[in-house]
Amino acid sequence: MKKQLTKKQEEILEFIKKRIKEKGYPPAVREICEATGLKSTSTVHGHLTRLEKKGYIRRDPSKPRAIEIVDDDFYVHRNVIRLPLVGKVTAGEPILAVENIEDTITLPYDLVGTEDAFLLRVKGDSMIDAGIFDNDIIIVKRQNVAENGDIVVALIDDEATVKRFFKESDHIRLQPENKAMEPIIVKDVKILGKVIGLIRRM
């Protein structure tokens, strides 16, 4: 049985739940300060530590927003899904190998539409004309095939690249959405998934 909470701890917990419901991810410590009238981030950290010890939340101290509600019913009722954020992609390893996972992010299920998906942080500006910018997080549906015109995550020389896919007569063209860049022409390519959405934190 979980230990009882103080009024302030209840207020903080409810704000965290509200923010996850509205935004799909938990608030930063400073946002908790502002919402609950606490002046010091160290005071919030103290309350979060007690909420964790009492079994209401889980945290990863190495990540600033990694607060997870310890209540599976909460996630079911809020109709959200937790997806892995892949930090790196390596040839010969499963895309979701534990050592490749950088974080886990909670998103509304309606935004994703499938559990067979992962998140990947975009590096570079090769897709800016498609509205995909450096440091955006893309939502990728796992699949190993693609249709012409799909934006895909493909593995090239041990590195993941995001490009538009075109299968032509005797080769595959991975087309950037940036007029300053040339397409990548390959005989064959490993498709990791199709891009179905993106997240941009302002």
UniProtKB/Swiss-Prot annotation:
CDD domains tied to this protein: S24_LexA-like
Enzymatic reactions: Hydrolysis of Ala-|-Gly bond in repressor LexA
E.C. no: 3.4.21.88
A Pfam family: LexA_DNA_bind
Residue ranges the UniProt entry marks as DNA-binding: 29-49
GO MF annotation terms: DNA binding; serine-type endopeptidase activity
Transmembrane residue ranges: none
Residues the record marks as site: Cleavage: 91-92
Key words, A-Z: Autocatalytic cleavage, DNA damage, DNA repair, DNA replication, DNA-binding, Hydrolase, Repressor, SOS response, Transcription, Transcription regulation
EC primary class: hydrolase
Domain of life: Bacteria
GO biological process per UniProt: DNA repair; DNA replication; negative regulation of DNA-templated transcription; proteolysis; SOS response
DNA repair in keyword set: yes
Coiled-coil ranges from the UniProt annotation: none
Active site: 126 (for autocatalytic cleavage activity), 163 (for autocatalytic cleavage activity)
Family: Belongs to the peptidase S24 family.
HAMAP family assigned: LexA
Subunit record text: Homodimer.
Function recorded in the entry: Represses a number of genes involved in the response to DNA damage (SOS response), including recA and lexA. In the presence of single-stranded DNA, RecA interacts with LexA causing an autocatalytic cleavage which disrupts the DNA-binding part of LexA, leading to derepression of the SOS regulon and eventually DNA repair.
Record-linked PANTHER family: LEXA REPRESSOR, LEXA REPRESSOR-RELATED
Name of the protein: LexA repressor
